[in-house]
A protein has these predicted regions:
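Basic/aromatic-rich interaction segments and small domains that mediate binding to polyanionic partners
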Residues: 2-57
């Protein structure tokens, strides 16, 4: 699965958010909003369960 900047993904832990930066083919900065604040963790391909929206298709 190819992940691009601005794709929306669902993580295995249930969070959903947008890819805001792609470091390489396996590491990304992920923007997730929770009840308290905006978080920008770095995630890897193994954290991603599915792509729910592809920027290239819109």
């Amino acid at each position: 699965m190819k992940i691009e900047e601005l794709d929306v993904v669902k993580l295995k832990d249930g969070r959903e958010g947008a890819i805001v930066y792609r470091f390489d083919d396996d590491h990304f900065m992920f923007e997730a909003k929770d009840d308290y604040d905006l978080k920008l963790p770095t995630i890897s391909m193994s954290d991603i369960e599915e792509v729910t929206w592809k920027v290239s298709e819109h």
